[in-house]
Curated annotation (Swiss-Prot):
It comes from Saccharophagus degradans (strain 2-40 / ATCC 43961 / DSM 17024). Residues 1-203 are annotated as: Precorrin-2 dehydrogenase /sirohydrochlorin ferrochelatase. This is Siroheme synthase. NAD(+) binds at residues 22-23, 43-44. InterPro entries: 4pyrrol_Mease, 4pyrrol_Methylase_sf, 4pyrrole_Mease_sub1, 4pyrrole_Mease_sub2, CobA/CysG_C, NAD(P)-bd_dom_sf, Siro_Cobalamin_biosynth, Sirohaem_synt_dimer_dom_sf. GO terms for molecular function: NAD binding; precorrin-2 dehydrogenase activity; sirohydrochlorin ferrochelatase activity; uroporphyrin-III C-methyltransferase activity. Residues 216-458 are annotated as: Uroporphyrinogen-III C-methyltransferase. GO terms for biological process: cobalamin biosynthetic process; methylation; siroheme biosynthetic process.
Amino acid sequence: MDYLPLFFDLKAKPCLIVGGGTIATRKARLLHKAGAKLHVVAPKVSEELEKLVAASNGKVFKQEYDQTFLDDVILVISATDIDAVNSVVAADCHAIKLPVNVVDSPALCSVIMPAIIDRSPLIIGVTSGGEAPVLARRVRSMLESSIPAAYGQLAQLASKFRQRAKDVFENGDLRRRFWENILNGPIAEKVLGGNLAAAEQLIEAQLDSASVEKTGEVYLVGAGPGDPDLLTFKALRLMQQAEVVLYDRLVSEPILEMTRRDAERIYVGKKRAEHAVPQQKINQMLLELAQQGKRVLRLKGGDPFIFGRGGEEIDLLAEHKIPFQVVPGITAASGCASYSGIPLTHRDYSQSVRFITGHLQEGKENFRWSEFVDKQQTLVFYMGLAGLETICSKLIEYGKSPSTPAALIERGTLPEQRVHVSDLAGLAAKIEGLDVHAPTLLIIGDVVRCHEKLNWYK
């Protein structure tokens, strides 16, 4: 280990910045955020930097640096663009063992500034020891995207109840279990969702009952159309903390691999004319697993509230007062259309869009076909592969032009994506014998004309 990470308490402590430009200002923002009293020495000082110094009750010296400015400060940052000045500042600090950071010159530093993830009071520093600062910033960016912004509030909540938890749970093991349940369960999710009052009430109730019983919860998460990069941050976070995963056929393997390695996986997939697990049984499984105190992930392709029967699955949970969350996913219409270069609405072609289930009940159609013939409307049929011929012929029968452009998108957003473009009269014949497999999405309307020009995902 080249450096030992330490955290510096700078509240009301005098710190010196040598330099007055953009880099010096950037460093001053960090020190000011940490509560430092800022002193700046430089012939020219930016307006923002002067304001930061004034806000910290420090002083600005518009002159050249000399060693006397090191008196009574506890940290020095040299941020000039003159190498000779930076070298002198570093040498002066080393001589009196005063911590110094010289920007972009690790060899001159006695301390280095990490890339920072600030979720105060939770603070994370990432450094490459000055060897690869761009890489350190890249790692910081990855952490920023995976650590919810409200983690700071969660840490503050834990601090607020820390002493009381010690008083209630004198046994260290019980106290640890209590905090594990708090920080990994529904109470933490209340905080992350912005409901601090409800979180405090739940903690109060557990402390009043001196209970460490684990509370179950269900996460109804939309996995999107297939590409793992289309997952939301919240979806990924819940996927990685669930202990049991119930998933269906439309969840792609790369997305399934992003769940916890040790999570129990239960396949409840559905195919046309075949239900691996009946819907009512799925609902009951979610309830029973949550009642066992488990964190349960119901992972569904697309969006759970668009042809996903998500409302049915959480209805039983609500009746039994089981905590649950619903995380929307990018629905197939949005994802597949975007990856096919087909805008669902377009100033020249379509002023509205309609989502329709293409899953014909027992092979029969019960739609109001006359509502679908408007030329300025885009039609999107989900699960329409088996009923494709019926859908196309019925639209033509009720007045839709046989030459209306139509596209059948197969395995949209995935590397195997194929887009079959024709018109209402010819699409069914075009895909005959092509070994097309679900999941598919059918888009009908003049917006399909954009595919040839805008198709970027090839």
